[in-house]
C-alpha cells in the first residue's frame, strides 16, 4: 500500500497567525475568551480550553468581561460588532485573517464607488456575516442572480476557484448590466490545495481528507476529491480505525487549513499499523 501526502498541508498562514496571537495572550492574561471557535478543529479547541481559553457563542457576554480578553477569530466580525465589544471587554485581540480583511475592505471601497456587491458564498458562513457589516446590501448567494446596473462580483475566500469562475460566467450570461467588475478574492492557499487534491485523487483508490466537520474548506476538498475517487473526511486520526481499506493500494492524504500537521503523521502511522496487522 502506497501513501501520497499533499505538499501543502497543515495550518494555513491565517490560522497559524491566529493561534500564535492566541498563545501569546495566554502567557499574558488569565481570563481569555474567543468569539466562536478560534479554528474548525476539535483537538485544537479542546487543547486551548484546557489552557484557559473559553469559547463564547454570539451575543453572550460573560460576567467577567471587564477583566477579560476577547479574541476575534480569523473569519472576522463586522465593524459595528467590534465597536460594541470594545466597550465591554478589557482587551480585544483581532486575529482576522489579512486575506479576509482585504475582502471586507475591497468590498466596502468598491461599494462606495457606486457598485452593487455580489458575493459568491454561503450566507450563513461567519465570514459572510461579517461582510454584511461592511456592505449591508451585499448580495451573498450560491446561485447566479439576474443583475442590472453597475456590478462587482467577488467571492467568499474559502470557496472553490472553479465554482467561482463558473458562477461568474453564468452571472454574466443572464444579466443586463451597464458595467461589471470581477475580483477574485478566493484565498490562494485554499485554491492551491484544491488543485493538488484533484491531482492526487486521480492517482489513488482512496482519498483521506483531515479536517473539522464544520470546516468549509475541508468539505470543499472532500467534494472535489470525490469526483475522481472514493473520498472520506475524518475529523480526528482515531477515525482511521473505521475506514475500510479492502482492495485499496494507493491512498492520498490532504488536510483542511485548520488541521495541524501532527494529525497527518498520526493518520499515516495508524494506516501502517492496520496494514501490518493483516
UniProtKB/Swiss-Prot annotation:
Binding site for (2E)-4-hydroxy-3-methylbut-2-enyl diphosphate: 40, 75, 125, 157, 215-217, 258
Protein residues bound to [4Fe-4S] cluster: 12, 97, 187
S-S bridge residues: none
Catalyses which reaction(s): isopentenyl diphosphate + 2 oxidized [2Fe-2S]-[ferredoxin] + H2O = (2E)-4-hydroxy-3-methylbut-2-enyl diphosphate + 2 reduced [2Fe-2S]-[ferredoxin] + 2 H(+); dimethylallyl diphosphate + 2 oxidized [2Fe-2S]-[ferredoxin] + H2O = (2E)-4-hydroxy-3-methylbut-2-enyl diphosphate + 2 reduced [2Fe-2S]-[ferredoxin] + 2 H(+)
UniProt-recorded name of the protein: 4-hydroxy-3-methylbut-2-enyl diphosphate reductase
A Gene Ontology biological process term: isopentenyl diphosphate biosynthetic process, methylerythritol 4-phosphate pathway
Cofactor remark from the record: Binds 1 [4Fe-4S] cluster per subunit.
Signal peptide: none
Residues the entry annotates as binding dimethylallyl diphosphate: 40, 75, 125, 215-217, 258
Source organism phylogeny: Bacteria, Thermotogati, Thermotogota, Thermotogae, Thermotogales
Active-site residues, record numbering mapped to chain: 127
Key words, A-Z: 4Fe-4S, Iron, Iron-sulfur, Isoprene biosynthesis, Metal-binding, Oxidoreductase
Function according to Swiss-Prot or TrEMBL: Catalyzes the conversion of 1-hydroxy-2-methyl-2-(E)-butenyl 4-diphosphate (HMBPP) into a mixture of isopentenyl diphosphate (IPP) and dimethylallyl diphosphate (DMAPP). Acts in the terminal step of the DOXP/MEP pathway for isoprenoid precursor biosynthesis.
Cofactor(s) recorded in Swiss-Prot or TrEMBL: [4Fe-4S] cluster
EC number(s) given by UniProt: 1.17.7.4
Biochemical pathway: Isoprenoid biosynthesis; dimethylallyl diphosphate biosynthesis; dimethylallyl diphosphate from (2E)-4-hydroxy-3-methylbutenyl diphosphate: step 1/1; Isoprenoid biosynthesis; isopentenyl diphosphate biosynthesis via DXP pathway; isopentenyl diphosphate from 1-deoxy-D-xylulose 5-phosphate: step 6/6
Presence of the UniProt keyword Hydrolase in the record: no
Cited Gene3D superfamilies: 3.40.50.11270, 4-hydroxy-3-methylbut-2-enyl diphosphate reductase, catalytic domain
GO MF term (any one): 4-hydroxy-3-methylbut-2-enyl diphosphate reductase activity
